[in-house]
């Protein structure tokens, strides 16, 4: 049985490939665009059966000439995740139409289809639950994900021939994101800032939040991969699911976890947030005028639906997850 992973050389895709490998699954077709060649490193430690360029893959899908038999599932992680990319033509072709064509093919072939949606569909909302009236995307990236989610909702009413699951990823961090540049996680940037300068910068107070007190639902990519495989194990489950921890944590906590993990590797003791600030290992910079009124101070996934689907595992909190991530970066990137 063959499994197809799109975006396989990317951040979440390569972690799904790795998680499949840990189960002994290696009959994997890795689909990606390696124009950004350094992404190959994410696949180098994985076992796959074949690599296929994204453009050739979608051509074969559209012409119904893929040569693989007995495809067990498609994990579709290939998309443009740059929220600052405002090229609507590219975004809708790459994120919406590509995904729609894959859905149609998987439904024709009765193949389970697990795809990446995004918490960006909620825009600046304060309630993050999988309900249409709460979804107000603010950019074309969020809209491309939102629009496809609406397709799934309609298809579910009409009846599906095979499982389809969309995961609304919140703030994912972890290994194999180094190619993402400015779109890499805050944990990634904090690590490199601390290693280069010896301190981490955070935004100061704004819009009722104190210094560094803005919060996000930070979720480890290890948990993201586990949940993808949980639904792979349960083909009777379809729908759209938030994929966060259900816990909102401050940027202060993330910065402290990163700095303390680096200090631990240097043989130094853990410091409290107060001590880190007093020693100027965490510094606060004025909140940028350009972001005032546009910056989201809080996100937190409502994971009620995920729990109702039977997923019982606990998530890494920021301290534990970032500690594991920093150890990986020190071993692989430093």
From Swiss-Prot:
Q: Where does substrate bind?
A: 171, 182, 189, 203-206, 216, 295
PANTHER family (alphabetical): ADP-L-GLYCERO-D-MANNO-HEPTOSE-6-EPIMERASE, NUCLEOSIDE-DIPHOSPHATE-SUGAR EPIMERASE
Instruction: State the source organism's domain of life.
Output: Bacteria
Physiological role: Catalyzes the interconversion between ADP-D-glycero-beta-D-manno-heptose and ADP-L-glycero-beta-D-manno-heptose via an epimerization at carbon 6 of the heptose.
* Official protein name in the record: ADP-L-glycero-D-manno-heptose-6-epimerase
Q: In its keyword annotation, does this UniProt entry include NADP?
A: yes
This enzyme catalyses: ADP-D-glycero-beta-D-manno-heptose = ADP-L-glycero-beta-D-manno-heptose
- Which pathway is this protein assigned to? Nucleotide-sugar biosynthesis; ADP-L-glycero-beta-D-manno-heptose biosynthesis; ADP-L-glycero-beta-D-manno-heptose from D-glycero-beta-D-manno-heptose 7-phosphate: step 4/4; Bacterial outer membrane biogenesis; LOS core biosynthesis
A GO molecular function term, named singly, is: ADP-glyceromanno-heptose 6-epimerase activity
Similarity-based family: Belongs to the NAD(P)-dependent epimerase/dehydratase family. HldD subfamily.
Query: What GO terms in the biological process aspect are recorded for it?
Result: ADP-L-glycero-beta-D-manno-heptose biosynthetic process; carbohydrate metabolic process
| Keyword Isomerase attached | yes
